């Protein structure tokens, strides 16, 4: 937190808090799909154009899309090729905007047990469940939690 404040200021830290709160709201809305927060919002390394990256898990894409439709969220779909070892796997990504840009990476249900590796650095991706995100918000943003929840 101290380094973030030193280099980027209070606005950056407040935006991180708001992005995490938005991610939590979305995760709660998507609970049937076991959402996990990944990327810059989970690590705290957000930049100006950062989006909220979530992994969701379903064996039926249409069920997810119906759920999004029922929530009234307008979205775009794309197929993204991810190289895993020596094979290429296609994954559906869903893009929408709710206060911030959101990207859902859609995986089969059983892949929730698979530790994904980052396409940028090859390291295991840390995925936060909603409870872990709540704990992170309370630990890293206690004064903002008190301010916004009172």
Regions found by a protein language model. Give the residues of each.
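Catalytic core of pol beta-like nucleotidyltransferases
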Residues: 1-48, 58-150
């Amino acid at each position: 937190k101290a380094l973030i404040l030193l280099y980027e200021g209070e606005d950056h830290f407040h935006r991180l808090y708001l992005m995490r709160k938005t991610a939590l709201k979305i995760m709660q809305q998507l609970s049937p799909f076991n959402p996990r927060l990944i990327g810059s919002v989970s690590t705290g390394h957000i930049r100006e154009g950062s989006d909220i990256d979530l992994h969701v898990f379903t064996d039926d894409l249409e069920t997810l899309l119906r759920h999004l439709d029922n929530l009234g969220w307008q979205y775009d779909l794309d197929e993204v090729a991810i190289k895993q070892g020596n094979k290429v796997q296609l994954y559906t990504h869903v893009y929408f905007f709710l206060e911030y840009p959101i990207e859902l990476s859609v995986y089969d249900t059983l892949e929730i047990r698979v530790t994904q590796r980052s396409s940028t650095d090859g390291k295991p991706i840390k995925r936060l469940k909603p409870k872990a995100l709540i704990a992170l918000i309370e630990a890293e943003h206690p004064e903002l939690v008190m301010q916004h929840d009172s």
